[in-house]
Every structure is written in structure tokens, then in C-alpha cells.
Amino acid sequence: MRIAFMGTPDFAVPTLDALVAAGHELAAVYCQPPRPAGRGKALMPSPVQRRAEELGIPVRHPVTLRDADAQAVFAALALDVAVVAAYGLILPQPILDAPRHGCLNVHGSLLPRWRGAAPVQRAILAGDPTTGVTIMQMERGLDTGPMLATVETPVDGKTAGELTDELARSGAALMVEVLADLPAHPPVVQPEEGVTYAAKIDKAESRIDFAEAAGQIERQVRAFNPAPGAWFEHQGERIRILACEAVDRHGPEAPGAVIDDALTIACIDGAIRPTRVQRAGKAAMSAGELLRGFAIPAGTQLASPPRT
């Protein structure tokens, strides 16, 4: 099939690779424009742009697809289908209508649960035991289009980074399967029941509130690994918790109290025991390594964000 691929981050790269490996004709790759990054703020191409250039596929990164010129250029590609994976731009109706089979999206949840920008993180935060990938026909609504196929994946204590990588691989394989036999995957309208929305992650959500239950904080740590990173503050410094375990607590300590020399921290229900942490500007380390160079003794009271 003659395809335009539209994607930007690491999540999208496996789908691009899978389309090429399956023998499809990639007419163009659309991705977000290069962004300033690093200390020097040099313009850095996205993971999809880098991979497309390695593969020798023409790359386009319009700032918008709303203007008539961009839409005419897209229509002139004479596509069978456009495949979309975390592209990051709204597709107006002329773009959705241009390919013969429309635009198919790789979405990182089991729709209609977790429509929106952050389905992986929201599934972890909610304690969902399973999530997955949906191949859907795009329409103007936010992830509201009919579904062609789904595949489930257990969450199993994974971080957002680990789960995203797994969903990227399974979504790539599922998209290739769908394209190989479109008549065998008729679109099914999403049910009206069970709709939830995966709002974009606000950095303010990443500060740990020890007045939450230990299980919820453990999910917060996994949901925000690798970014933006769940953190607490001590002596004016942010300490990121990269991994922790939720443990029982039977003492009278207030939430936020460090209750032993292993950095076990009391929560409103239970306690958390960090296993991997990171100081600002430092490499990740074990909790023991942190404590050898940064005193947080038993009895220390760690602050939680003010409640509004």
C-alpha cells in the first residue's frame, strides 16, 4: 500500500519500521519540527525524523495542516492510507479524507478507556491491571473513531517507559496485521459506556504527597518514570524516586516521617521504601548510596505539597 506515516516520538518508531519491513511504499513521513534541546538549545530532530532519514524516506514537518497549501501537498501524495502514531498535530477533515482508506491511528489504550494525550500514565495511576493498543479510524473527535483491532497487555508493575515500549511494539505488529487484510477488520463503533479521558500530565502532579496511600504513591512513581519523575523535597533539594515498593506500617508516625535507616517513608496508609533514587544533576543510585552521601535519618519529617 502507498502510505504516509505521521508520528513524532520514540513510541512511533516501531510502527514506521514495521511498515517498511512489511514492504509498504512510504510516500512521506510527517513529524513535528525540530525542537531546541540540551544546554545549547540546538534544534534537535524527533526520533521519527531521524529514523526516516536513515531509511531514506522524505520527511515533512509542517507547523500546521490547517492551511490549504499543506492540504493540497498531502492530497497530491495519492495515498491508500495514512498511519498515525503520536503525531502531535490535529488532523483537519481534508487530511482525514484524503487517503483512500482514511487515517488509521495507533492509540496506546483499550478504547474507549483513556482517550487523550497520556493513556499509559493514566492507566498506571488508576491501577488498571491491563491496558493495550487500539487501531482506530480517525475522525474529528478526540480518539472517538471506530475501532479496527485491539490487543491487550498486562500492566504488571511496569513503569510508563517500559509499558510504552511494549505497547509501541505490539501496536506496530497490530497495524501491519490490519493493513494486510483490511476487510477482515471492519470498523466497530466505540461503546458509549466506559469512556475515560487521559488528560495531559501536569508537572505539578509529579510531587509526592505522603498524605496519599502507599499503593497510590508507588503507582505515581511508575507512571512518572522516566518523565517527569515523581519527587519529594529535602533541605531545598528535589529527590526523584525512580522505583519503590509499598510496605505495611503499624506505627503512629505521621505521613512523610522517615521511619527507619532504609529511607522507609510513612504514608497515610502504609509506607513506601524507595529502591532507586536520583538527586538533581546526579546519576540514578540506590537508596543506600543516596544515604551514604546525603543524610535523611529516621525521624526526619518530609514535607508534602500544600493542600488546596
UniProtKB/Swiss-Prot annotation:
It catalyses: L-methionyl-tRNA(fMet) + (6R)-10-formyltetrahydrofolate = N-formyl-L-methionyl-tRNA(fMet) + (6S)-5,6,7,8-tetrahydrofolate + H(+). InterPro entries: Fmt (IPR005794), Formyl_trans_C (IPR005793), Formyl_transf_N (IPR002376), Formyl_transf_N_sf (IPR036477), Formyl_transferase-like_C_sf (IPR011034), Met-tRNA-FMT_C (IPR044135), Met-tRNA-FMT_N (IPR041711). This is Methionyl-tRNA formyltransferase. One of its GO terms (cellular component) is cytosol. Keywords: Protein biosynthesis, Transferase. Attaches a formyl group to the free amino group of methionyl-tRNA(fMet). The formyl group appears to play a dual role in the initiator identity of N-formylmethionyl-tRNA by promoting its recognition by IF2 and preventing the misappropriation of this tRNA by the elongation apparatus. GO terms for molecular function: methionyl-tRNA formyltransferase activity. It comes from Rhizorhabdus wittichii (strain DSM 6014 / CCUG 31198 / JCM 15750 / NBRC 105917 / EY 4224 / RW1) (Sphingomonas wittichii). It comes from the Bacteria. It holds the Pfam family Formyl_trans_N. The gene is fmt. Belongs to the Fmt family. NCBIfam families: fmt.
